[in-house]
Amino acid sequence: MNLLDNATSCFQKQLPFVLYAKPNETILHGIFQNDETLNVFESQSGFVFASFYSETNVVFPLSNSEVLQEEINFETEDNSFQLETKSNENAQILFEKLVRNGVSEIENNTFEKVVLSRKIEVSQQVDFIKSYQNLLKKYPTAYRYLWFHPRVGLWMGATPEQLAKITNNTFETVALAGTQVFSKTISWQEKEIVEQQLVTDYIKS
């Protein structure tokens, strides 16, 4: 049984698991917790899933998990599909109001930068395994993960940001704000430079 099959089995049994691949690597890692316990991170070795605001961070402890790895199979079929989003006029109105409020707060110097988001609901079932295969194949330079806990939910993503890298006594992180499509020649505009500096200053403080 490969790691994707393992993940499918765990999801059906409602057991916690995480799959992840590091940037520019072709090894897929899997951590499969042996029971459905919601473990709060204290100092255990394991995979930590931390919310930005929550004081409770979840960990899959290595001492109570099966840890596996395998080469990523990139010879998979194209699983791309078009998502059909539910039309919600009220949600659009609320989001536009949120944007106006955000602009107003910036003008009032409440804060310098704000990132707004909204929830999008889709009308069809999504095969999360096929979607994750797409992430693995299409974003090889990103950290690609698929995380599930029955008491928290299922999360999937591909991020170019490096949270932390520690080598001997050197700590490295990435302040990623201004972004654009990668090309051999990149020209950063004033807007991106200012946004980048805001994040850099926040991390340093």
Label every model-predicted segment:
Residues K22-V122, E190-I193:
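Non-catalytic accessory segments adjacent to catalytic cores
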